[in-house]
Amino acid sequence: MSARRLTRRNLLLGSAALVPLLSRRADAFGEKSRFIPAVARHGGRWDLRLSGLRRIAWELQRRTSVEVVPDARPFALGSPELFEYPFLYFGGEGSFPALTEAEVANLRRYLTYGGFLLADANDGSDGDGFDSSFRREMARVLPQNPLAPVPSNHVVFKSFFLLDSAPGRLLNKPQLMGAMLGKRAAVLYSQNDLAGAWSRSESGDYEFDVSPGGEPQRELAVRMGINICMYALCLDYKDDAVHLPLILNKRR
């Protein structure tokens, strides 16, 4: 992996003077420079799409030059270990209890220091269930940075593949929602169950049907996942920094 792709991780570790640095374990296994999805543990059903995260990490390595560990590592939201991981997945089905004040403060610090959060409504909810709980907590974590629609010309739609929407297992909402810190999307939120489209069983079969678009929609969901991972890894992505030659090849 290039030094540029490590920018966000380095910022997190370099900025985390207020929390312990816990990188010895990662260094010992040669993992520090590899992409590993972290998963937010909360009081609800947070662990429904671990196979999807492992799969998107595998797809990221297969389709790009990013080195990965195809795993999904759960952490409490109050854990200082979050700061070792530039990408944090926060998914769930149904409502979940309020985060503690310590969890809210740690997640705010993580995002402020350069961490990235992908939220994913596994239940496809809108106004209730996971959606209601997540919006409630984001209003606590980033009260001055509300979720808003991400325009289709945002760099996340062209960070690797050229896309114009963000389908998942479902297509309830064609747009992503995002919370901006300056010019950076610190949070992206899908109500389409992105990881549900990625998930495979141990036998290798996809776990869930994709609706309404079937397998072409699943491929778009995988491409969107790769775009999001690439965006999460590159702190300084600009419109002119996208992989234009690869886009021109991959868009066909």
What are these regions (language model features)?
Residues 1-18:
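N-terminal secretory signal peptides and thylakoid transit peptides that target proteins
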Residues 40-42, 90-93, 120-123, 150-152, ...:
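Active-site-proximal beta-strand/loop segments in catalytic clefts of secreted hydrolases
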Residues 87-131:
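Short alpha-beta junction capping motif
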Residues 22-87, 94, 194-195, 202-204, ...:
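Aromatic-Pro/Gly-enriched surface loop or interdomain linker
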Residues 84-92, 159-166:
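Charged, often glycine-rich, active-site loop that binds/positions anionic groups
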Residues 72-77, 100-106, 172-174:
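Alpha-helical scaffolding within the catalytic cores
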Residues 124-222, 226, 251:
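An acidic, glycine-rich "communication" segment
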Residues 50-53, 57, 104, 108, ...:
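Extracytoplasmic/secreted envelope proteins and their assembly/folding machinery
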